[in-house]
Design a protein with these regions (language model features):
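Class I (Rossmann-like) S-adenosyl-L-methionine-dependent methyltransferase catalytic domain
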Residues: 1-40, 50-96, 117-120, 124, ...
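A short acidic, Gly/Pro-enriched loop at the edge of an enzyme's catalytic core
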Residues: 96-104
Length: 201
C-alpha cells in the first residue's frame, strides 16, 4: 500500500486546481494577520501543500515561508510563487534553522497525527513561534479515525484523525493558550492560539 506522502505527491495537481481559485479561507487569513497585529509579519505556512494559502498570505502583506513534505506539491508551489521561500521537510523534523516567526498557519496539518507525533508537532511549532505569537490551527473535531484513502483507484495508508480540543491542549503541553474560535464548517474547526512560554530560539 502506498504511503501518506505518496498520496500528496500523486494528488498534488488536484489540490492546486481546487484551491488556487477557492478563496474560502481568505477571511480566516485576514483575521489571523489582524491577531498578529504587525506590519509585514513573518509567517510560517506549515504543511503548505501547493502554496495556495502562502500566496494569499503574501498578497495580504506577510513575509511567508512555506514548509511541506510533498516534493510534487512544492514543485507547484515554487513554480507559482517564485518570490516565496519553500522548504521540503516533515513537520515532525526540527525546522528551528528557519528562524523565528510572528505567526504560524497550520491548515489541516495535524489530521494525520496522534499520540507522541502530535506532541512533537506542537513542540516544533513552539520552538519557532515568538512569545505571544499567533497560531491558526485548522482541524476536524471528533473521535473518528479513517485508516485509508483511495485516489484514482489506488489505496493509500493515510490515517485521517479527528481531534478533541482537550487532546489538542494536552498535546500542546502548556506552550499555547486558546484565544478564539472563528466560525466553523461542519466538523472543521478554525481556532486561534497564542504562544505562552519563552521561545527556545
Amino acid at each position: 500500500m502506498k504511503s501518506c506522502k505518496d498520496f500528496y505527491d500523486d494528488s498534488a495537481q488536484m489540490w492546486a486546481d481546487n484551491w488556487y481559485e477557492d478563496e474560502t479561507l481568505l477571511p480566516y487569513l485576514k483575521s489571523f494577520l489582524e491577531h498578529i497585529g504587525k506590519k509585514s509579519p513573518r509567517v510560517l505556512d506549515l504543511c503548505c501543500g501547493a502554496g495556495y494559502e502562502s500566496m494569499r498570505l503574501k498578497k495580504l502583506g506577510a513575509k511567508v515561508v512555506g514548509l511541506d513534505f510533498s516534493e510534487k506539491e512544492l514543485e507547484i508551489a515554487k513554480n507559482k510563487n517564485p518570490e516565496i521561500e519553500f522548504h521540503e521537510r516533515n513537520m515532525l523534523e526540527s525546522y528551528k534553522d528557519l528562524g523565528a516567526f510572528d505567526g504560524i498557519v497550520c491548515i489541516a496539518g495535524i489530521v494525520h497525527l496522534q499520540g507522541n507525533d502530535l506532541k512533537l508537532a506542537f513542540d516544533n511549532m513552539a520552538d519557532v513561534l515568538k512569545p505571544d505569537g499567533c497560531l491558526l490551527l485548522v482541524f476536524r473535531e471528533g473521535t473518528e479515525i479513517i485508516q485509508t484513502t483511495t485516489y484514482n483507484d489506488v489505496e493509500y495508508n493515510r490515517n485521517f484523525v479527528y481531534h478533541s480540543r482537550e487532546n489538542i491542549l494536552k498535546a500542546m503541553n502548556g506552550n499555547f493558550e486558546f484565544v478564539e474560535e472563528l466560525q466553523s464548517f461542519d466538523t472543521w474547526k478554525y481556532l486561534f492560539y497564542k504562544r505562552t512560554k519563552k521561545s527556545l530560539l
